[in-house]
């Protein structure tokens, strides 16, 4: 008896009919047994039929025989959504309510949570909130109904027509505002007063094109960086955009970057960081390709956001804010080269732009936006760098406001003049010192005023606004909460040894 037959008989006696260590036919040095079986599947994958064409042996994946199976009797198989008990839902709702308004707490895996059940809607102002209390169902429908006809707010058909026209007009206005995210609202405020007509130049940054660019940036960003001017952070803060994001996109992260901190004292930058950190994470920054400040802290913060969203292939970071606050300069600083066009004038960035920072982090540059407000005067808009000074008519009328906002010794040190009594004398002295005279020896007031305004906006003249919670005044002279904070002329300087902490 051959060796193969002896081995086969031994396996039969031991009850082991498996192949064991027998090699597959065709297995050699170049192909292992797994590869040979894989190739045999292609070769022998045809079905076998008899002379009549009936199927005798089906090819792989051709058989229609369904094996007997049993479905697990679990309620999750028979529901179209995930299920959760009311106790667990209430417990999670209480835990979420404690951390909901904390900007330093991040909710992960939001898509797997029933956010519509966790967020309780306020129905106190809804007209149908208390309809069951005023008109019970049993007294309205059924055999005990007492209402003869539906109650209508209008007393007559004419009143109903007027109400319909009013609602239609409000709907058209809302439809027009929706294209600008609802931010270009009417200029009339809650206190009932409105601002007088302004020049067309002071409405820059409020067009529909700008709002469309802002909408695209917010919609495409996972993290939104609000760039503020360190000299006047509250003036360059877009509160209406923040309210919109809080209401419509609560899952997006919003942080503040206090740019141009090199133009203010160190103690002031630290005070503003402490004040703004109560609302959002805030960083002090100085945009410069060669000598920057805060670059490492910002990159580290962006990497933390990237680690929080490991389930995504990449995250996008959008930069928004007032014109000429340094959004494009911050992007150039992070990339350490010029990838965005920058200029010391507002409106240089026209459309949004995608820039790659690293493999998983992308940056989005946005044009500057100016949320309309009736309380903003022409001086406020001009001093925030929203408009170009050369397009302003009669720029000398804004020089008195410059003298009020700046300290006298700063102006004397910048222009090397002294002894002026008012704005007119200041312009005349500066024009004669620089030799800017017209025919007849008259000073060029318009040209000198434009120069002073440009120096004011570009940081050549030191000025700043102190935080509102610094050095509170007595109760008798306390200003309202919505008033303008004190200027540099009123703010006392603390000791110079106070260092900035980011």
Swiss-Prot record:
Paired cysteines (S-S): none
Pfam families in alphabetical order: MMR_HSR1 (PF01926), NGP1NT (PF08153)
One Gene Ontology molecular-function label: GTP binding
Cellular component per GO, a single term: nucleolus
Region of interest (Disordered), ranges: 1-20, 459-502
GO biological process, one term: ribosome biogenesis
Binding site residues for GTP: 321-328, 365-369
UniProt keywords, alphabetically: GTP-binding, Nucleotide-binding, Nucleus, Ribosome biogenesis
Basic and acidic residues compositional bias, start-end: 468-482
SUPFAM superfamilies attached to this UniProt entry: P-loop containing nucleoside triphosphate hydrolases (SSF52540)
Cellular localization per UniProt: Nucleus, Nucleolus
PROSITE patterns hit by this protein: G_CP (PS51721)
Chief localisation class: nucleus
Keyword Methyltransferase: no
Entry-linked CDD domains: NGP_1
Protein family: Belongs to the TRAFAC class YlqF/YawG GTPase family. NOG2 subfamily.
Protein name, per record: Nucleolar GTP-binding protein 2
High-level lineage: Eukaryota, Fungi, Dikarya, Ascomycota, Saccharomycotina
């Amino acid at each position: 008896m051959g060796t193969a037959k002896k081995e086969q008989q031994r396996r039969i006696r031991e009850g082991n009919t498996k192949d064991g260590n027998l090699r597959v036919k065709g297995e050699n040095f170049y192909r292992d047994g797994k590869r040979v079986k894989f190739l045999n599947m292609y070769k022998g994958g045809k079905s076998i039929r008899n002379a009549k064409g009936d199927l005798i042996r089906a090819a792989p994946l051709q058989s229609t025989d369904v094996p007997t199976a049993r479905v697990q009797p679990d309620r999750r198989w028979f529901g179209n959504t995930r299920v959760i008990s009311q106790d667990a839902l209430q417990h999670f709702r209480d835990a979420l309510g404690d951390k909901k308004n904390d900007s330093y707490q991040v909710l992960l895996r939001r898509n797997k949570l029933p956010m519509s059940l966790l967020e309780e809607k306020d129905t106190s102002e809804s007209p149908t909130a208390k309809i069951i209390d005023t008109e019970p169902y049993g007294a309205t429908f059924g055999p005990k109904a007492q209402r003869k006809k539906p109650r209508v707010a209008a007393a007559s058909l004419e009143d109903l027509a007027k109400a319909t026209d009013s609602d239609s007009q409000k709907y058209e206005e809302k439809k027009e505002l929706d294209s600008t995210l609802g931010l270009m609202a009417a200029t009339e405020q809650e206190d009932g007063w409105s601002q007088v007509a302004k020049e067309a130049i002071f409405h820059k940054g409020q067009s529909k094109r700008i709002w469309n660019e802002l909408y695209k940036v917010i919609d495409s960003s996972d993290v939104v960086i609000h760039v503020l001017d360190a000299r006047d952070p509250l003036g360059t803060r877009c509160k209406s955009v923040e309210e919109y994001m809080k209401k419509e996109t609560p899952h997006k992260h919003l942080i503040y970057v206090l740019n141009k901190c090199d133009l203010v004292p160190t103690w002031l930058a630290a005070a503003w960081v402490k004040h703004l950190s109560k609302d959002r994470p805030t960083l002090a920054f100085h945009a410069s390709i060669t000598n920057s400040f805060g670059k490492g802290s910002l990159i580290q913060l962006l990497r933390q956001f990237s680690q929080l969203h490991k389930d995504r292939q990449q995250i996008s970071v959008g930069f928004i804010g007032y014109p000429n606050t340094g959004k494009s300069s911050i992007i150039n600083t992070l990339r350490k080269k010029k990838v965005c066009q920058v200029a010391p004038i507002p409106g240089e960035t026209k459309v949004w732009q995608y820039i790659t920072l690293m493999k998983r982090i992308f940056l989005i540059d946005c044009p500057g936006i100016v949320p309309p407000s009736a309380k903003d005067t022409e001086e406020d808009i001009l001093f925030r760098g929203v408009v170009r000074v050369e397009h302003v008519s009669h720029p000398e009328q804004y020089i008195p406001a410059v003298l009020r906002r700046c300290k006298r010794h700063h102006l004397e040190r910048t222009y090397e003049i002294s002894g002026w009594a008012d704005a007119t004398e200041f312009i005349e002295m500066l024009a004669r010192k620089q030799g800017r005279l017209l025919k007849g020896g008259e000073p060029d007031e318009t040209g000198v005023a434009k120069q002073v305004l440009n120096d004011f906006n570009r940081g050549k003249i030191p000025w700043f606004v102190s935080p509102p919670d610094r050095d509170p005044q007595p109760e008798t002279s306390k200003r309202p909460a919505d008033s303008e904070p004190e200027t540099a002329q009123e703010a006392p300087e603390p000791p110079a040894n106070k260092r900035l902490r980011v």
